[in-house]
Amino acid sequence: MEQAYEAARQLYAVDKTDYAVSAMFWTAVDRLKELAVQDQLHEALQIHLALQRLMAHLNTESPMMSEAMMKCAAVIERLKVRKSIADNGPLHLIVGLWGEELAVDFLRKKGYRIIERDWHSSHKDIDIIALDRSCYVFVEVKTRSSDAFEEPLSALDKKKCKNLSHAITHYRCYRKILSDWRFDVITIVGRPGSDSPQIEHLMDFAL
């Protein structure tokens, strides 16, 4: 994606036709999402600013571009929140973010491709959306600093499962996904700095 973005930038530098503008816009949107998955806030902000400048020079603004810009702004805000929590947030939020990072790394090592992180639909969210070959995998991450009092899975109650089901349905409709999909849960017991956190991957978990 980085190479595609650079190629679109070079084209746009010498060509301001609708085709070049469209190529620049959509590769920038995809690049911003890629940087968000990698937690690269500074670089994502630069792409977002470039998109804002591009939008300011458009002769006509399409509804799809406007919607994409709103989603990019939401992605940036979530990145800022994650960074703020990681820097000075309360312990339970720091542990939760650490668990999500661990889960992303765990999935990548298993060959999964991370598509989205912290995807939101209204007040419902999906922690990780990944591809396992051609199968879309929606992942909920549950992290506890200790299992002495409560298992991580205990937080996945009936209401949470219902919200996840709605969010997954919304995402599949929005992205027009017709291929296979499943819902996984990754449970983690440990805290930042742990030498050997306990990680369990529950595949095809019933909602």
Cite the ranges covered by each PLM segment:
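Alpha-helical junction/boundary sensor with strong preference for TPR arrays
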Residues: A8, Y12-D15, M55-S62
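Residue-level signature for tetratricopeptide repeat
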Residues: T27-D30, E34, V75
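Acidic-basic catalytic patches of nuclease active cores, encompassing PD-(D/E)XK
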Residues: L79-R117
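Conserved catalytic cores of phosphodiester-cleaving nucleases, focusing on short active-site segments
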Residues: A103, L107, I126-F149, L164
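Mg2+/Mn2+-dependent nuclease catalytic core
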Residues: S145-Y174
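Domain-level recognition of nuclease-like catalytic cores that cleave nucleotide substrates
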Residues: C173-L207
